């Protein structure tokens, strides 16, 4: 099993001023971590729940 390409992308908070609780996959640590997404911009390494992050990037 191979994780999707976006699991290897660095976290990007985006360029707006809002704060949404989100999770990203930290490739070097092989785990999902919380961060605050600004509401726009960013990248595909962003998940609404830790469960979604783990499912997509760890296959669990």
Swiss-Prot record:
Keywords on record: Calcium channel impairing toxin, Cardiotoxin, Disulfide bond, Ion channel impairing toxin, Neurotoxin, Secreted, Toxin
MF terms (GO), sorted A to Z: calcium channel regulator activity; serine-type endopeptidase inhibitor activity; toxin activity
UniProt-listed Gene3D superfamilies: Pancreatic trypsin inhibitor Kunitz domain (4.10.410.10)
Organism superkingdom: Eukaryota
UniProt subcellular location: Secreted
Tissue: Expressed by the venom gland.
Main location per the UniProt record: secreted
The BPTI/Kunitz inhibitor domain, residue ranges: 7-57
One GO location term (cellular component): extracellular space
Disulfide cysteine pairs (residue numbers): 7-57, 16-40, 32-53
Family according to the record: Belongs to the venom Kunitz-type family.
Role description: Potent blocker of high-voltage-activated calcium ion channels in the nanomolar range, particularly the L-type channels in cerebellar granule cells. The sensitivity of L-, N- and P-type channels to CAC is tissue and species-dependent. Blocks the L-type current of cardiac cells, depressing cardiac contractility.
Annotated PANTHER family: BPTI_KUNITZ INHIBITOR DOMAIN-CONTAINING PROTEIN, KUNITZ-TYPE PROTEASE INHIBITOR-RELATED
Protein name, per record: Kunitz-type serine protease inhibitor homolog calcicludine
